[in-house]
Amino acid sequence: MGSKRRFSSEHPDPVETSIPEQAAEIAEELSKQHPLPSEEPLVHHDAGEFKGLQRHHTSAEEAQKLEDGKINPFTGREFTPKYVDILKIRRELPVHAQRDEFLKLYQNNQIMVFVGETGSGKTTQIPQFVLFDEMPHLENTQVACTQPRRVAAMSVAQRVAEEMDVKLGEEVGYSIRFENKTSNKTILKYMTDGMLLREAMEDHDLSRYSCIILDEAHERTLATDILMGLLKQVVKRRPDLKIIIMSATLDAEKFQRYFNDAPLLAVPGRTYPVELYYTPEFQRDYLDSAIRTVLQIHATEEAGDILLFLTGEDEIEDAVRKISLEGDQLVREEGCGPLSVYPLYGSLPPHQQQRIFEPAPESHNGRPGRKVVISTNIAETSLTIDGIVYVVDPGFSKQKVYNPRIRVESLLVSPISKASAQQRAGRAGRTRPGKCFRLYTEEAFQKELIEQSYPEILRSNLSSTVLELKKLGIDDLVHFDFMDPPAPETMMRALEELNYLACLDDEGNLTPLGRLASQFPLDPMLAVMLIGSFEFQCSQEILTIVAMLSVPNVFIRPTKDKKRADDAKNIFAHPDGDHITLLNVYHAFKSDEAYEYGIHKWCRDHYLNYRSLSAADNIRSQLERLMNRYNLELNTTDYESPKYFDNIRKALASGFFMQVAKKRSGAKGYITVKDNQDVLIHPSTVLGHDAEWVIYNEFVLTSKNYIRTVTSVRPEWLIEIAPAYYDLSNFQKGDVKLSLERIKEKVDRLNELKQGKNKKKSKHSKK
């Protein structure tokens, strides 16, 4: 990071310390003087309903007696008629048949592995079985159940709150990044695995919990893998803590071995036979082929809802529009039944996610009404949608890939694994025999799809992970017990990046800046940029830009309306690039004019995504609270000042100095600094001039290498802000190094001239 020279009384020589480092040191001192208040003590109901029962000795019969009573033992209120109806449905789930067997295993072991196919009821029922045995409300503890995805954490918490006849956010709640719907009454908390990891950074023993359930462990997310390694250590220190590892797939022996031969209980799902159909040849346009297949099913097949798997929000929303339009046409022209089409992806607001559980529309003239759910791979195992009889599987999903040599992490549309294909097909056989239409050949399934997806830890940039592990007190990363250890090169890259960001010192120890950066739920690069932004007199603006970078794309560009959408975007465009354009969009969104116009209509007319913008607004507020908590100054430069935009670009360079590209001399495109990758600027950028040097937010791997969300910067800023990274002795020979050498000479000459002038001034003043 860039350095300022700071003199201290203990050190007569100047000590080089970056601005963010100084801010972190001050924040650390202040927090020692004024420690943050700990969380509120838990408050629970106890009117003796559990009297006579012994913790960790509850039988299924005793628990069911409490469930069948008139009074809710967790609230003291009478059960509602709706509760009684739901209880009957719950008792029919496959897990209920094995409640006694589960309890015996749970009571006699500290760690157990539970396998239940999607639809067996494991995610909603097992945590409730645990509550009746743990009695957390009498012990002042909580039960945690982690989910890899936010959507699942929210929707499952809502369902379980209904099942337990309690209010969501009270006895049952959820915690996801930037949203906490729990209270001091909460005894069962559904949360993303990342949120539990953040809690562990503050409380290494997770002392608030008496039982932790890691659900969907087969997904092998980064956070789940780290939690598993961490919990292996915690259980040694906490013999009172119980762990349940839950998986939807039967390859659970690996989990058993990892947890020292933990016992396993498997519960079969309720599945009916599923007929598989393959295409005779490769489908060039899988999206078009998927839409045609859905419409063909609707026109020709018997009653039953359809689940279509696609790769992301844009693709899903496009398909929702097309299927809705063509479905209406089928109703009018062919007399087909009505069609309700619902999207499902991570950034969808909770009330819209819930619509997927609505019943299908009524039949019309004897033709069945149908519900179509178009989802990312979240519907593979995380959520169960009743009524699905037909699955359309194009065979793709978005997967993160990372190349440590060129430090590029990208989301790529890639073929799914055989395990995923089987999970998808299984969704069709939940309520009756179903059909799965695979939009690829049988030969491709047998020969081209890998058996299992690679764990996320093997295909990710590990900077955030290493910072988390350091904050968790794990210094020996080489010997940390990963289920699948990442490549040493990936680990080295992460350590190197964190060292350049001054989050780790040269010995690999956490610095005050690293400790402070780890408090922000952001990529370390963004956290460091935000912490140091006050020095550039623009922390308010950087706060906004960071929030805007943390949400899905705010610009909407419909296929039929590209020209209008581009014209609307140009209203906000700033010639220096996309980051300041995002700032302009946010300011316009928050303006009185937009609200007087009607904010939803304003967003529609300007081709902006209201959901993304309101999410950015929420994230900004939360980050602002963190800034205030750690006494980080919130400031801005006068908008009329000629320095206003330069200050913002300098602050951006202080975070993105490792993501820089230079225009190629005498050739088209750019070349990335240090890694020498040929790249093009993404067509979506608004950069209004041929900038020589740019920072970029992401590297997009498609048929060509693109850099996206770019802003022009001056190379002298980079040398000044990040001298360690721009130590030219570490650069390969070539155009980038030559240019930087020339700029460095120029900067050094200017500095010498300044120093010469200052010496003359001091001589005159002495005279």
Curated annotation (Swiss-Prot):
Enzyme Commission code: 3.6.4.13
Domain Helicase C-terminal positions: 293-473
Extent of Basic and acidic residues compositional bias: 58-70
EC supergroup of this enzyme: hydrolase
Effect of residue 395 to E: In PRP43-1; temperature-sensitive
SMART domains in UniProt: DEXDc (SM00487), HA2 (SM00847), HELICc (SM00490)
Pfam families: DEAD (PF00270), HA2_C (PF21010), HA2_N (PF04408), Helicase_C (PF00271), OB_NTP_bind (PF07717)
Compartments, as annotated in UniProt: Nucleus
Record bears the keyword Nucleus: yes
Residues recorded with modification Phosphoserine: 8-9
Annotated residues for binding of ATP: 116-123
All copies of domain Helicase ATP-binding, residue ranges: 103-268
UniProt keyword ATP-binding, yes or no: yes
Reported effect, residue 247 to L: In PRP43-DN2; dominant-negative phenotype
A GO molecular-function descriptor: ATP hydrolysis activity
Assigned GO CC terms: 90S preribosome; mitochondrion; nucleolus; post-mRNA release spliceosomal complex; small-subunit processome; spliceosomal complex
Xref: PROSITE patterns: DEAH_ATP_HELICASE, HELICASE_ATP_BIND_1, HELICASE_CTER
Record's keyword terms, sorted: ATP-binding, Helicase, Hydrolase, mRNA processing, mRNA splicing, Nucleotide-binding, Nucleus, Phosphoprotein
UniProt miscellaneous comment: Present with 16900 molecules/cell in log phase SD medium.
Family: Belongs to the DEAD box helicase family. DEAH subfamily. DDX15/PRP43 sub-subfamily.
Functional summary from the UniProt entry: Pre-mRNA processing factor involved in disassembly of spliceosomes after the release of mature mRNA.
Subunit composition and interactions: Component of the NTR complex (NTC-related complex), composed of NTR1, NTR2 and PRP43. Interacts with NTR1 and NTR2. Interacts with SPP382.
Protein name per UniProt: Pre-mRNA-splicing factor ATP-dependent RNA helicase PRP43
Source organism of the structure: Saccharomyces cerevisiae (strain ATCC 204508 / S288c)
